[in-house]
Amino acid sequence: MTELNGIRVLVTGATSGLGAAMAAALAAAGARVMVAGRDEARAKTAAAELGPSAIPCQLDVRDERSVVACIARAREAWGGIDMLVNNAGIGMRTVNPRFMSEPQPFWEVAPSGFRDVVETKVVGCFLMAREVVPLMLRQGGGRIVNISMNEQTMVRRGFVPYGPAGAGVEALSRVMVADLAGSSVTVNILLPGGATRTGMIPDEVPDEARAALLDPAVMGPPDRLACLRRRRRRARPSHRRDRVQRGIGDAMTALASASPT
């Protein structure tokens, strides 16, 4: 499949879970993909699995110097970036390993854990977009897709700092849209639904509990997403919040190929 015909896509947090599924779907549809992640070895392995159209990049989205270096690597390899997928994130299990069975009140959350989640998700989105947008404006256009969560998760009991981080991404995305109005750079928010097999959920959580997080009509398990049939769907990549249908791989290729009007 060459639906995306060589467009240049940088995916953060692309070494596992949803990020890996998005990278695989994009590569299968013909995109050139930069697989970015904190662990250099995992990034190299993940990129190798996607084939010659993918290149790895070690990236800590919280670190401005790391962000600048990763964008520079993409420019050196491709000459530009057509699409940025801000997917990198840290789940609740790093703050409270038993968050599903024993919600932790916000006043018991360690400040260091709060900062780590928020800096990875919100500050990371900001730093990546801040570095990429001037490049996209100079080249005549581009797309940014910020991965967030549904509103119910944002305000769920015991979901500090994960919920506030998602809310921050949504607010940041809306400001990006306003600031980029009239340009050819578009911004979307993608809401994937339950992350049941991505490392976000503790290993001891039973399958029944995982199943409750995942609506088959909305999203498939991550290891199946790259195999789903991708359909080209027109989208309006501006103010809309996109809900994944038939798998996040479908949604990502749809956004990548949609008309910018």
Predicted regions and their residues:
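Catalytic loop of short-chain dehydrogenase/reductase
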Residues: 90, 102-113, 143-168, 173-174, ...
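Conserved glycine-rich Rossmann-like NAD(P)H-binding loop of the short-chain dehydrogenase/reductase
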Residues: 31-45
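Conserved glycine-rich cofactor-binding loop
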Residues: 15-16
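C-terminal helical subdomain
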Residues: 182, 189-191, 208-249, 253
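Active-site Tyr-X3-Lys motif and surrounding loop/helix of classical short-chain dehydrogenase/reductase
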Residues: 69-76, 95, 100-108, 112-119
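A short, exposed helix-loop element centered on a Lys and neighboring polar residues
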Residues: 129-130, 174
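The beta1-alpha1 cofactor-binding region of Rossmann-like NAD(H)/NADP(H)-dependent oxidoreductases
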Residues: 40, 59-71, 111
